Each structure stands twice: as C-alpha cells, then as structure tokens.
Amino acid sequence: LAYISPEAETEKHRAEVGTAYLDFQVGKSQILPDFRNNASELDKINSTIRSVTSDKNITPKGIILKGYASPEGSYASNDRLSDNRVKALRDYIRSKNDFPQSFFTLENEPEDWAGFKAQAEADYDMPARDEVLSIINSDLQPDQKEAKLRALKSGSAFSYVLKNIFPSLRRSEYRIDYTVREFTVEEGREIIKTRPQQLSLSEMFAVANSYETGSKEYNDVFEIAVRMYSSDPVANLNAANISIGKGDYESAKKYLSKAGNSAEAIHARGVIKLIEGDLDGAETLLKQAKEAGVIDAAANLRELQKKRDDNALFDSFNMHN
C-alpha cells in the first residue's frame, strides 16, 4: 500500500466560531449583561475568546461579527438597529480584551429572510405555510412582504412566526481567526491527544511515522487525521490504507470515494479488487498505478498473476476429475 505525505501548510489558519442569542430592549442597542439570558450568552463569547487568547500556541488575527435581525418593523429601522447592536457587541468584547478596533470586521443582516425561509420550509405546523413561503419568495420589498404577512389569515400566521421563528433569527454570529505555530514531532505527539485541530496534515503524517508502521498509535493518527480533515483526498487515502490493513474493506471503499484519483488512490482501489477476487478489474487499476510510478504496484501485479495461475491450476484439476 502506498501512503502520501501531505503538503505542508505555509501558515496554519484556524477559526473558532459561535452564535450568541443576545436579548435587547425593544428598539435599543445597549448590551445589558443581566437582561434575560444575556449572562450565559456573553459567557459563551467570552469563553471562546479566552480559549484563543490563553493558548500560547496561537496568535489571534481578527474577529468577524455579524448581527442578524428578524423581519419585524421597518427595514430602515432594522438596518440601523442591527448595525448598532453589532457595534455594541464589538465594544463589549473590547471592554473585556485588549483588542484594537481594527481587529474587528463588522457585518449585519438587517432582516434575515433567508433564515426565515429555511425555518418556514421545515415547519409543517405553521398556519398558512404555503402562503407564507409564497410571500417570502416574492419580489416585493421587505416592508411590503411584512405587510402582507401581517394581513394573512387575520394575523394568525404572523403571530405564529413572531413567537416561534423570529426569536431564533435575532442573533450574533462570531468568528475568531487565528494562526497556530509549527510543532516538532515530539510536541505533535502530545498535541494530537488534546487539540488535534492545531496540527496540519503534514505534522500528523510526521507524528504517525514516528511510530512503528501498523502499530495502534500509527493507525490512530491516520484515523484522527481523516476526522479532522474529512474532505481531504490525502487524509482519506491514508485512512483507506489503514482500513485495508485491518481487513475493513467497506470503510476503505468509503474513504477511497473521497480520495481523488492520484496514482496511490488508484493503486489502493486495485488492491481491494485483488483481495475481493476481481482480477480483471484489479489488473486494470494496478497497471495504471504502476505506469504512474507506484512502486508497490509491481509486487501486487505479481501476486495477481500467482492468483491467476492458481485459479488455472484449480480449474485444470477439476476438469480432470
């Protein structure tokens, strides 16, 4: 089996993300920590920021804040309000941390019609659901849409969304961008146990190769790698090879479906076909892999020929008996 060494990241960019549901007094943008459930929501934000600022391996690079409001009231008013509220959140974070104003990127969604649509589509208990969706999807201006919603079914549909959907649309999404320093193999052996997301794929590969090939530790690292980088072709190929080594061919096929078409991935698919007895399919793939430079392909083609010879001998024996 042929493993691939991943390319090194020139700089390891990572992010912590979250959503806070802060409550504001009607028409106001001041953050009141003791108002309703704000204390626990602010704790979530502070905890996420602390997880970054307290880690000596991390350099914070910036915070993106995006405020969302629900489609209730005039669009112009909601635009002002969501803008002021996201600025208030920035100022609150700055009051707790030594971040310059330039550290922040602010965005706002005055009325979250996309979120409203997604929730309406999923809510089959909503009164006049089809009519509500028709209004949401129309080309009307936001304030005109709201007026039509308020008039629908004598206001029962709007009362429903006001209570059951709009509260969850009013939120602040935050993302803290940071970079992570490089680790030695010895450091990587420890970091992978507690904060694997801080390791690059190439660092994980180096950690894996510091263990005996096929050992539990070796296999564990590749399995962690594919969990952390689930869509990466290299991580999936290496995990597939581990699964083949364990005899877990179904898992190997699942990983190989996301492993791309590198010579090594083609080789691994050929190995599975060889094991499963599809000698013609295996030969096609193994020859492709050999031509593309996979050294192990030649040995597997010899193994394939031995199987063909054994099958021919077996068939010949049966014919004479």
Regions found by a protein language model. Give the residues of each.
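Residue at a conserved register position within TPR or TPR-like alpha-solenoid repeats
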Residues: 209-212, 243, 273, 305
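Periplasmic OmpA-like peptidoglycan-binding domain that tethers envelope proteins to the cell wall
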Residues: 70-174, 246, 274
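Structural motif corresponding to the intra-repeat A-B loop/turn of tetratricopeptide repeats
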Residues: 212-215, 246, 276, 308
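TPR alpha-solenoid repeat register
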Residues: 235-236, 265, 297-299
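Short coil turns that delineate tetratricopeptide repeat
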Residues: 198, 230, 260, 291-294
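Periplasmic peptidoglycan-binding/anchoring modules of Gram-negative envelope and division proteins
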Residues: 2-15, 24, 29-66, 94, ...
